């Protein structure tokens, strides 16, 4: 593996992303890393991906990955560091190094991104390796060069949603507190009429909830938004504020939702192992909780795909598991596996009818 990037979780464990886009977790950063994903978490587009960088702030996990051939990077967000959503647009591309006076640095390629964070975990500075031509055209004693450059970032605002009940399409009003910081005074620095709040899919395109009124709260500002058009669904974990400062520059920020659990169990299964006896086929499968809190009882189902249809192999109960605890689950199956045939297995872990995780693998049961 290469191009590894790490973020520390709340319990001091670590989540890691590798160049291939797999997500791994280690209990302390020194013990073994276990891969939880069976496919890359990057956007489902063609690209030569490398140099992923992952970090966690007080709201969520962030991930940027670079397509070195296309010279474009993508930005993803996650509640738990395992399941990711991709934001539209580009995280960066040639032309992003622009000074306050308008001068633009014409670097050909930006790579090896690293983030400098503040005490909240917010990214406040991006460090890049840059070059002004193709690598193989940068020769000794020529006029080309590569450098390390640092670009200051807009860290985003500190926001708190004050609604106690879940926000839906029917929510009448949304109350949001904007916290004052050194150098930022929300009561005087924001263009209030420009503010929009809601799901990223809405506010990124100029939609979202509009301001109804504001009220001062010490040095902070409480903004009441009309709930109409917020776009927040049951899967939302970090709604977004976007708008302008009075000086015309962009402002933004993410907020947590007070009714969402941000630290949950993360159940993951290993590949099932089968053995044949006189009575038929038996199997066992290991399920481990990589979450930071205990899990409830769950279930696991094993299937394989044949002629376009899913064939059930077995299902079994998964006991409640403490953080990092594992269970070896045994089962019997009426399935009859053929010698030399490849099986496309799907392992699904459920909590009731809710899918917690899936794991796909292709393997022969009988050589």
What does each model-found stretch correspond to?
Residues 152-165, 260-280:
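Low-complexity, acidic Ser/Thr/Pro/Gly-rich terminal tails and inter-domain linkers that flank the onset
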Residues 243, 334-367:
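Terminal connector regions
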Residues 286-292:
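Asparagine-centered strand-capping/turn motif at beta-strand->loop junctions
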Residues 292-298:
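Short acidic/proline- and small/hydrophobic-mixed sequence motifs that coincide with surface turns
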Residues 309-338, 349:
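Intrinsically disordered, low-complexity Pro/Gly/Ser/Thr-rich segments with frequent PxxP/GP/PP motifs
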Residues 203-254:
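Structured beta-strand segments within beta-sheet-rich domains
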Residues 1-160:
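Carbohydrate-active catalytic/glycan-binding domains of CAZyme proteins
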């Amino acid at each position: 593996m290469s191009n590894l990037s790490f973020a520390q979780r709340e319990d001091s464990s670590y989540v890691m992303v590798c160049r291939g886009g797999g997500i791994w977790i280690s209990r302390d950063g020194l013990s073994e890393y276990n891969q939880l994903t069976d496919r890359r978490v990057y956007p489902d587009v063609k690209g030569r991906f490398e140099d992923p960088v992952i970090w966690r702030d007080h709201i969520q996990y962030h991930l940027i990955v670079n397509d070195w051939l296309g010279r474009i990077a993508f930005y993803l967000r996650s509640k738990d560091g395992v399941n990711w959503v991709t934001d539209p647009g580009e995280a960066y591309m040639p032309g992003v190094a622009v000074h306050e006076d308008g001068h633009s640095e014409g670097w050909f390629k930006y790579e090896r991104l690293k983030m400098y964070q503040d005490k909240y975990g917010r990214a406040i500075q991006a460090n890049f390796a840059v070059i002004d031509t193709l690598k193989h055209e940068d020769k000794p004693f020529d006029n080309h060069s590569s450098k390390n450059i640092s670009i200051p970032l807009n860290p985003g605002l500190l926001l708190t949603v004050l609604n106690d009940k879940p926000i839906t399409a029917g929510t009448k009003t949304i109350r949001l507190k904007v916290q004052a910081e050194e150098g930022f005074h929300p009561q005087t620095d924001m263009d209030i009429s420009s503010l929009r709040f809601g799901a990223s899919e809405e506010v990124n395109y100029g939609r979202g909830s509009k301001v109804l009124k504001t009220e001062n709260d010490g040095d902070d500002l409480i903004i009441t938004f009309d709930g109409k058009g917020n776009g927040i669904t049951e899967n939302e974990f970090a709604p977004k504020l976007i708008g302008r400062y009075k000086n015309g520059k962009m402002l933004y920020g993410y907020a947590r939702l007070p009714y969402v659990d941000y630290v949950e169990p993360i159940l993951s299964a290993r590949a099932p192992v089968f053995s044949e006896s006189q009575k038929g086929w038996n199997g066992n499968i290991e399920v481990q909780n990589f979450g930071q809190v205990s899990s409830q009882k769950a279930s696991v189902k094993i299937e394989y795909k044949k002629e376009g249809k899913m064939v059930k192999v077995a299902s079994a109960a998964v006991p409640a598991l403490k953080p990092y605890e594992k269970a070896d689950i045994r089962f019997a199956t009426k399935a009859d596996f053929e010698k030399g045939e490849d099986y496309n297995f799907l392992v699904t872990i459920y909590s009731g009818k809710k899918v917690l995780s899936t794991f796909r693998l292709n393997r022969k049961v009988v050589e």
